[in-house]
Design a protein with these regions (language model features):
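Glycine- and acidic-residue-biased ligand/ion/polar-headgroup-sensing regions
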Residues: 40-53
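A short glycine-rich, His/Asp/Glu-containing loop-to-beta-strand
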Residues: 1-36, 41
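Double-stranded beta-helix
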Residues: 2-6, 78, 82-119
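Short acidic-glycine-tyrosine-enriched beta hairpin
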Residues: 57-76
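Structural motif
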Residues: 51-53, 68, 76, 84-86
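Short hydrophobic/aromatic-rich beta-strand segments that constitute the beta-sheet cores
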Residues: 34, 54-56, 89
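Short, surface-exposed secondary-structure edge patches
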Residues: 24, 44, 59-61
Length: 119
């Protein structure tokens, strides 16, 4: 398992192959992901534990444990952890296909090499 530290928590990469990627996302309460979209990456996210507020284009939705949602390209999206949050993400394998429109930590688009250094 590869662990990728993020400013908002961490990603645990359980599987990455030519067909799909499976990650566990752990987002700390009060933290949020970047406002982003993808050109090609399609992802379905399942809430394992906690409460998330999710922006999908221009609509905010609340998801709790047992809920899931799918993000199709080029949907603009962001997740906010209302509580400590554990998510499972299954996606197509284009893991570096991230266009950040806004980020609390001024991270650029795509892969952030420093987040992967100790993985």
């Amino acid at each position: 398992m590869k662990i990728v530290e993020k400013p908002w928590g961490r990603e645990e990469w359980l599987e990455l192959n030519d067909n799909y990627c499976f990650k566990r996302l752990i987002i700390n309460a009060g933290q949020r992901t970047s406002l982003q979209y993808h050109h090609h990456k399609l992802e379905t996210i399942y809430v394992v534990e906690g409460t998330a507020e999710v922006l999908l284009d221009d609509e905010w939705k609340t998801f709790v444990a047992g809920d899931y949602f799918t993000v199709t390209p080029p949907t603009v999206h962001r997740m906010v952890a209302k509580t400590d949050l554990i998510l499972h993400e299954v996606s197509t394998p284009q893991v570096d296909d991230v266009i950040r429109l806004a980020d609390d930590h001024a991270r650029p688009d795509g892969r952030i090499d420093t987040e992967h250094e100790n993985a």
